[in-house]
């Protein structure tokens, strides 16, 4: 990295990082190169603006944490070169904004998009996000001793974030240790929404919804391996189960070398599925393959993890079931006895608004998607530069508007359904206006009791970790081969941890 005084370009400083232009707000100073790949660069930077600090993610106040004045800045290159990259970037930006503010979901500080100094074209985007010490993959790989309370805390926080995501009818689809960011206080946040998709209870509305499914193989649910077409929120629960097993054993539970081997590894541990389950969750070809295999008995988790808490193994078994209909839900998992030490209804909030994928998922033209991304960046930059009270007011209005639209849509569906069932009564006035809660999508339920919290967990030591959490963007634990799925670099892997950035650049143009 070039340490010379950076020249100014469009009000930003031009830095040399990995022999590429890295153009950032002049009030940030590059501290360290964190990682690079085919489609991006990540650096840590310090916010240098007198005594001011970057606002905290949850309340907009200056944070007192050690990293309060430090951020991770991610440059994504060639963003408009391919439709698939553009669509995933658009997905990521919209979802980061929608979930912004939840303590267990990554949240954005700021966005920036400027023309390339050499070509003058807009083909790069910069994401300013909170700097976290590492990700879960690095912690497990480091061999640091973790207590059972650490396991409980991490899984509980993952489930709190996932509960909020699922309540908005969103499936993450790529949960893995590398997409779980952790700091020295054992705070965990889910990142990387580039592969997320919407979910509907109506299977017909999910048609085509699993296209481009290229999530890391080791954490894929068996119904995906069996080419099942009716996917549910249970696919994310399976991934959480794989993460829990990796925490307990110190290594991934299902480490398939390829697509077929991954399915074989799952069946070796879970055993041959009943015929009724196989017919329900597998394609005809997949069913024939499983029937051709020798019948296998289910392995014992007590033997696989002899030192594990029995309650942890009970939760693991409920998460890792072949039949997605029998898999535990995120809400029931939060109430499991293994997590009762951490259970707090105030932390288990649900989203009050459903995320709208329809507004952009049907857009396929590269130019149109490019314009949508440019608009998203501009709107977000304007939003975060408003006073915190104005931000909250705008967010409240948007959520109320979206809730009203969704209410009307549900009423229309109900009316059409009743007209279909009772055509002679089409003129009947059956539309009823339900109550309208004036809540934001980060609403917190009223709880009378203050739940006691367990003693603070031991802090981590990060000196023996190889790199920052930002490196999860370019790492691939299960390197694919052939045409089975795209390299991790081509997935972009957006999403680091972040926080509210309301007064970051009030006078920045």
Swiss-Prot record:
ATP binds at residues 34-42, 74. GO terms for cellular component: cytoplasm; nucleus. The modification Phosphotyrosine is found at residue 213. Activated through phosphorylation of Thr-211 and Tyr-213 from the TXY motif. Phosphorylated in a PKC1-dependent manner in response to cell wall perturbations, oxidative stress, osmotic stress, and low temperatures. Also activated in response to physical contact leading to contact-dependent cellular behaviors such as invasive hyphal growth and biofilm development. Phosphorylation is also PBS2- and HOG1-dependent. The active site is at residue 174. One of its GO terms (molecular function) is ATP binding. Keywords: ATP-binding, Coiled coil, Kinase, Nucleotide-binding, Phosphoprotein, Serine/threonine-protein kinase, Stress response, Transferase, Virulence. Its EC number is 2.7.11.24. Residues 400-448 are annotated as: Disordered. Disulfide bonds: none annotated. It catalyses: L-seryl-[protein] + ATP = O-phospho-L-seryl-[protein] + ADP + H(+); L-threonyl-[protein] + ATP = O-phospho-L-threonyl-[protein] + ADP + H(+). Residues 392-423 form a coiled coil. A motif (TXY) lies at residues 211-213. This is Mitogen-activated protein kinase MKC1. It comes from Candida albicans (strain SC5314 / ATCC MYA-2876) (Yeast). The gene is MKC1.
